[in-house]
Amino acid sequence: PVDIDRYDFIRLGVKERWAVLLPAEDPLVQKGFVTAADLVGKELLFPARLKVQNELVSWFGDYFPQVRVPYTCNMSTNASIMVRNGLGYAFHIEGSRPFLDRSQVCSLPLYPELAATTVLAWKKRQPFSVTTTKFIEFAKNFVKTYNNREQ
């Protein structure tokens, strides 16, 4: 979820899945995905943004009162280090995982899937240079063409 109230934006149409970073030796790795029930009793690292936290709480449903969220973290690099050092399981967008040793930290998608869409955003009523204006026009046309091709 993105707070776009103060911004003009283009929705890029790319779906990004949420996933969990966990220690590579965790038995859940063999399962290939993570459910809310799998995370009961685990210490979790949530993203710091409240809108994202609300999405995750909703995904957990009735299981949420049974989990602990002692930490928040905005950077997947920091989250990976915290997971590697045994501080918990971290939520992140699949593919945002930094270049750490995969033999220490793994990423598994959530099931049921929780997805977000990406936006390209810029401040409303902002004067832009010619270059920036041309870039925004290009991006709008590109996304429109791309989305029409995907349908």
Q: Where are the predicted features?
A:
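Secondary-structure junction motif
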Residues: 42-64, 128-130, 136, 143-150
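Short clusters of hydrophobic/aromatic residues that line enzyme substrate/ligand-binding pockets
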Residues: 28, 69, 107
